């Protein structure tokens, strides 16, 4: 029984040393290393002879020695692998940072657009408030222009009627002028006609005087 216990302990220690020799990183066992010690130990245990116990006792020692000697190498490999893993993670981080920056840039652009839209939305109510005033002013202006246009349109017929009235007035004035000119001509004629009569009368008066002599 004691031999069996030692066998179990030896196999457990051998597995642990083999695992250390293979190298454990962050709880993940790497299987890249050669696992030569385990089959030898298992083969010795499978023989079941008395010499196997001695071989088992020697095998753990050699395994422990190999493990001690391999430990620095595994530590160096582990450090290298850690460095490589760190580099990979850094690269991944760099890529992720770039991607995140890109996404952040896009999100910032979107946020900027959203903020601009929000600012415009905030500004639009004020402009909308201003616009109703402008629209109100424009409406009042249009209303003012419409009556002005109506007044301009309505005087147009009146203006058209006024020239007709003016034309009628000159026509009425023309007959008046004609009537005025006609009496003046008659008066001039009447004034001219008595003049010869007056001239004839002296001749008649002059004639009888010599006749009387």
Swiss-Prot record:
A lipid is attached at residue 2 (N-myristoyl glycine). Expressed at low levels in brain, eye and muscle. Disulfide bonds: none annotated. Residues 149-158, 175-185, 193-205 have a biased composition (Low complexity). GO terms for cellular component: cytoplasm; cytoskeleton; plasma membrane. The keyword Disulfide bond does not apply. It is a lipid-anchor. It holds the Pfam family MARCKS. GO terms for biological process: actin filament organization; blood vessel lumenization; cartilage development; central nervous system development; neural retina development. Residues 54-64, 77-88, 161-174 have a biased composition (Basic and acidic residues). Keywords: Cell membrane, Cytoplasm, Cytoskeleton, Lipoprotein, Membrane, Myristate. InterPro entries: MARCKS. It is found in: Cytoplasm, Cytoskeleton; Cell membrane. GO terms for molecular function: actin filament binding; calmodulin binding. Disruption phenotype: Morpholino knockdown of the protein results in reduced head and eye size and a ventrally curved body. No significant effect on formation of craniofacial cartilage. Formation of ceratohyal cartilage is disrupted with an abnormal angle relative to wild-type. Morphogenesis of the developing neural tube is abnormal, with a smaller angle between the walls of the hindbrain neuroepithelium at 24 hours post-fertilization (hpf). Retinal development is significantly delayed; no retinal ganglion cells (RGCs) are detected at 30 hours hpf and reduced numbers are found at 60 hpf. Residues 1-213 are annotated as: Disordered. Residues 90-113 are annotated as: Effector domain involved in lipid-binding. Belongs to the MARCKS family. Involved in the control of cell movement by regulating actin cytoskeleton homeostasis and filopodium and lamellipodium formation. This is MARCKS-related protein 1-A.
